[in-house]
């Protein structure tokens, strides 16, 4: 059935409000460039912020433009069950709070691929970098596509500006949006993202709740709203395994398992938010507040428009056509229930959602490019040594150029997703496809000490190859475990593919790791053969050939071999990957797990500090500062103040402006130096003033970090 696309709604006042908002956010984000003294500031906001700013920032990232569009669409079609995706993240949160979060902070990694190099090997970093960049670029593409679909209903076919007639197209609209978003993240960095998100997060919550509350009033109040909804719309869960486009079991595997772990553990954009908190404790508070309070509210914010639209369609069927495009439902219902200007504000909220999510992801891609591509390549080309100090000026330039480049790649990725009928299905396919191998790699790497480089690389290469076979043969490989979900020949098992992908990736990871002793034995025997390099090179050629065969078979369906033959080849190829990795990769299980798994976090804290921990409880102190000569990164306190703080020279200190509403914007980290005798005074160097941008005469608060 052809769906009706809404066009040319809204007024000139709405456009004025939208444009003013976009310009304001551009200027606001660019303003924060002054807080970027180095790449630590650009990517991680200087590790300075308190929990409430990060919690609100996470809201703006989680409630992206595709959330408004896709959950309102599902709310319109299926009711309150559209909130399932926002209520199923809780059971993985403890693993994040007490496992992954302290690991990534205390290990001082600057990207997820860097963690894999330290935990496994440089080759592991290479493969994870490829998957991570694909994940982030794809996510950016979905964001841009959604933004275009959301704003397109407002657009006429032509727009006249100063006498010139401009033809409006979806891709043209997306390119303009990309320029705006790319500009402020390119120059503002992570601090720009966090503070624009503080504004946008509040705006998103207010706009979404306003649409829901005003919509309920529009249909006659809560009693009328409740009675207008069909009984099935009031259920908290969708059908167990039907319809194919939205069901509980599919949502569980695609979103609750793959999506939740992917969002918490591997979404570098989100992780960089937590790395911008002043310490791990603040990050834990931000995550806890988000899961207990922000996500339930967010479920109403993004789904409420669809619920109201359903009630309006029952009350007055003429206002909302039966065959309306579900992706337009939030924009349409907002236009119906709000007046000129207010509707523009609501659309600006969607713009805020896109800008928040995409800017976060672009910042993350730039971080990965600088840390995991640019620097390793320069080391490989012998232009620099691995331990050389970073050229911050060059790194900042590379970060900004790469941000602009990934903005363009994100727009190009739109073409890959535009063929899907709805954003919800496109996003589900994206989650089910790119999340499982990285999810298994991260989860096993952090929580299973015995997980080896062979297990990881076999998961990434062999697991992905088996996933490709699942896409090519869904009836044979996915349907037996699809829990009875209907088969859609155009988009087969969009959700249940996540379960299949998780099974094959987990199976490869576990089996290869458990066979590590046997793999080492075989590798040692091969090393004794005179022409062992020829054997290994032949295996590498075989691995590449089989992987190419799997790709050709899925995309071109050339039927090189029947399913049984392809599965056999792929399994044998996976064994070869494990053997080649075991043969070439040097791995010290003790050294490369200490401080990098959940079982040795205390050691990671010592590494973070650089000395033994001082965990004595102390008090925070209020101080003023005095500038002294020197360029050493230490701050000197009085003996009395250090006694209050239970601090010793060499301990870590965090000092901030006492104005809580700044959320740590004017703050910095340093080290306790030798004490002096001026109580209530700290001795700063100019570098501390530059980092913290403290205001002369303002009272500061200092706390011992560890």
List where the protein language model places each region.
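Short beta-strand-centered segments at strand-helix junctions
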Residues: 611-656, 667-703
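Membrane-embedded helix-loop-helix hairpins and adjacent transmembrane boundary segments
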Residues: 1-611
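Generic "edge-of-domain/loop-turn" microfeature
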Residues: 37, 281-282, 642, 660-662, ...
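Short, charged beta-turn/beta-strand-edge "cap" motif at the junction between a beta-strand
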Residues: 658-662, 705-706
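Short active-site-adjacent helix-start/loop capping segments
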Residues: 65-67, 663, 691
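Short secondary-structure transition/capping segments
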Residues: 222-223, 702-706
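Short glycine-rich, polar/acidic loop-and-turn segments at beta strand-coil junctions
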Residues: 58-62, 72-74, 641, 657-659, ...
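Short, structured interface segments
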Residues: 514-522, 695-704
């Amino acid at each position: 059935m052809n769906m009706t696309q809404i066009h040319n709604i809204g007024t000139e006042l709405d456009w004025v409000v939208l444009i003013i908002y976009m310009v304001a956010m551009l200027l606001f984000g660019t303003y924060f460039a002054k807080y970027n003294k180095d790449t630590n500031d650009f990517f991680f906001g200087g590790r300075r912020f308190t929990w409430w700013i990060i919690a609100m920032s996470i809201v703006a990232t989680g409630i992206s433009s595709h959330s408004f569009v896709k959950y309102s669409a599902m709310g319109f079609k299926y009711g309150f069950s559209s909130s399932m995706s926002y209520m199923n993240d809780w059971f993985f949160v403890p693993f994040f709070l007490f496992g992954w979060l302290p690991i990534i902070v205390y290990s001082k990694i600057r990207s997820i691929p860097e963690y894999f190099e330290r935990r496994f090997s440089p080759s592991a970093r290479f493969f994870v970098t490829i998957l991570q960049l694909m994940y982030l670029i794809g996510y950016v593409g979905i964001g841009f596509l959604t933004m275009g679909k959301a704003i397109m209903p407002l657009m006429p076919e032509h727009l006249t500006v100063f006498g010139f007639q401009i033809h409006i197209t979806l891709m043209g609209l997306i390119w303009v949006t990309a320029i705006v978003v790319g500009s402020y993240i390119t120059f503002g960095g992570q601090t720009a993202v966090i503070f624009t998100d503080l504004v946008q997060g509040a705006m998103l919550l207010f706009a979404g709740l306003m649409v829901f509350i005003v919509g309920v009033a529009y249909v006659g109040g809560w009693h009328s709203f409740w009675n207008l909804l069909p009984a099935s719309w009031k259920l908290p869960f969708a059908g167990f395994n039907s319809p194919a486009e939205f069901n509980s079991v599919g949502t569980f595997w695609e979103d609750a398992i793959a999506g939740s772990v992917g969002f918490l553990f591997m979404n570098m954009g989100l992780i960089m938010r937590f790395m911008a908190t002043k310490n791990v404790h603040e990050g834990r508070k931000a995550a806890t507040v988000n899961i207990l309070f922000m996500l339930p509210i967010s479920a109403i914010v993004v789904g409420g428009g669809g619920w109201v639209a359903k009630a309006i369609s029952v009350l007055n069927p003429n206002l909302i056509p039966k065959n309306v495009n579900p992706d337009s439902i939030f924009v349409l219902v907002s236009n119906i229930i709000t007046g000129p200007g207010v509707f523009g504000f609501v659309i600006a909220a969607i713009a805020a959602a896109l800008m928040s999510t995409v800017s976060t992801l672009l910042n993350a891609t730039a971080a990965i490019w600088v840390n995991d591509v640019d620097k390793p390549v320069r080391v490989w080309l012998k232009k620099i040594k691995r331990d050389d100090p970073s050229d911050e000026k060059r790194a900042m330039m590379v970060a900004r150029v790469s941000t602009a480049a990934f903005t363009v790649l994100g727009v190009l990725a739109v073409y890959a997703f535009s063929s899907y009928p709805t954003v919800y299905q496109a996003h589900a396919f994206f989650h089910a496809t790119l999340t499982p191998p990285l999810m298994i790699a991260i989860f096993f790497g952090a929580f299973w000490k015995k997980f080896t480089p062979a297990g990881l690389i076999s998961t990434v290469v062999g697991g992905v190859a088996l996933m490709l076979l699942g896409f090519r043969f869904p009836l044979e490989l996915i349907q037996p475990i699809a829990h009875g979900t209907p088969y859609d020949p155009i988009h087969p098992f969009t959700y249940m593919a996540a379960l299949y992908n998780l099974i094959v990736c987990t199976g490869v990871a576990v089996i290869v790791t458990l066979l590590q002793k046997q793999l080492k034995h075989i590798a040692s025997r091969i090393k004794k053969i005179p022409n062992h390099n020829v054997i290994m090179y032949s295996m590498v050629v075989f691995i590449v050939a089989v992987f190419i065969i799997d790709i050709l078979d899925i995309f071109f369906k050339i039927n090189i071999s029947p399913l049984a033959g392809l599965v056999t080849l792929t399994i044998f190829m996976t064994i070869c990957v494990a053997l080649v990795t075991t043969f070439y990769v040097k791995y010290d299980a003790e050294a490369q797990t200490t401080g990098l798994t959940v079982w040795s976090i205390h050691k990671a804290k010592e590494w973070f500090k650089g000395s033994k921990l001082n965990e004595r409880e102390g008090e925070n102190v209020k101080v003023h500062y005095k500038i002294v000569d020197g360029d050493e990164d230490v701050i000197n306190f009085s003996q009395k103040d250090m006694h209050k703080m239970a601090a010793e020279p060499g301990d870590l200190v965090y000092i901030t402006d006492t104005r809580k509403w700044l959320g740590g914007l004017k703050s910095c980290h340093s080290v306790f130096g030798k004490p002096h005798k001026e109580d209530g005074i700290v001795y700063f160097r100019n570098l501390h003033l530059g980092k913290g941008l403290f205001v002369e005469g303002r009272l500061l608060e200092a706390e011992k970090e560890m």
